[in-house]
Amino acid sequence: MCIRDRCPIPEGAAGVCKVRFVEGGRLHVPWGYVGGVQCDPIEKKPFFHAHPGALAYSFGMLGCDLHCGYCQNWVTSQALRDPRAVVPPTDAAPAALVADATRLGARVLVSTYNEPLITAEWAVEIFRHARAAGLLTAFVSNGNATERVLSYIRPHVDLYKVDLKSFDDRHYRQLGGRLDPILFTIRRLHEMGIWLEIVTLLIPGFNDGEDELKRLTAFVASISPFIPWHVTAFHKDYNMSDPENTTPEMLVRAAAIAREAGLHYVYAGNIPGRVGDLEDTRCHHCAAVLIERYGYLIRSYRLTPSGTCPDCGTAIPGRWSVAFDGQIAATPFLPGTRRLRTV
């Protein structure tokens, strides 16, 4: 199964992702291990319109089809491309992953850390077990997909976050990809009815130009003004140490552009408490505060069981729980450092 276009794999070679290869005339794909697991609030993914406060059990493998110089998960995503990225894989079984997630109280299993599209077969197998156990499923992805892989994962994925890294094809080519496939994926996910949220990591001097942000947010609004768009703060990481870290003022400016483009649900992240109300969810009709946040912490939750505004009755787009059973507490869930025990 081709998970991205323009990636023919000859006999005895690996694809761009470095993890899918052809041997003996057969395509071999990653299976049976994890590069890391962690349990965190779902807001960390981030999903703000899907079961707020729920714990998300995240797992990843190794490898990626892009090579972003600022990758914050480079130890796993670039493990087969960069000799500095050394992560020993841990053998895993789908049933063991789901059991571990259930033990920790997670409600969602998330394929993340590396690029889940290049390990889609493994994720789908885990998601089959997760669904059988009553859990939800999600991808956190660069969105560099084809129709074939989207059709393959569609029956098994509830939530999907796409990193829309830029709206300039030249920038995408620097990262090893192209813009058009990402835009195709965003359109198709929305058409398929998979709950979609989009994130753009705002990098000074790379993708923060006013014109680019206007075009990016206008594109998202043209698909649906109700798609949540998160603009998050860059910090120096991996091979990108030249740009200055993103400031709160930069995030607020980008959010204003998004609102002018017609997006109703715009969020600023990674700098808790310094971006005004851009961490909160407000009703797009009457502007009532529905969910108040500080970082990943839910401070208040006012949505009705049917997912409507309690003040004006407007339906709020998202995937809401019938009853809020997440965390409203003084401190958010603090994950441990343990690694998965497999069977």
Language-model region placement:
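Conserved Radical SAM active-site core
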Residues: V22-L159, I328-P335, V343
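Short clusters of hydrophobic/aromatic residues that line enzyme substrate/ligand-binding pockets
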Residues: C17, L27, Y172, L290
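Short metal-coordination and nucleic-acid-contact micro-motifs, chiefly zinc-binding Cys/His arrays
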Residues: A13, L55-C64, E279, R302-P305
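Short, non-ligating residues that shape and space the ligands of small metal-coordination modules
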Residues: I9-A13, R26, Y70, S77-Q78, ...
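Short cysteine/histidine-rich zinc-coordinating motifs and their immediately flanking basic loops
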Residues: G12-V19, H28-W31, L80-R84, G295-Y301, ...
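Auxiliary Fe-S-binding modules of radical SAM enzymes
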Residues: R4-P8, E210-V343
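Short, cysteine/histidine-rich loop/knuckle motifs that typically chelate Zn2+
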Residues: M1-R6, V16-V19, G63-L66, Y70, ...
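Conserved AdoMet/S-adenosylmethionine-binding subsite of the radical SAM
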Residues: D91-E249, A254-I257
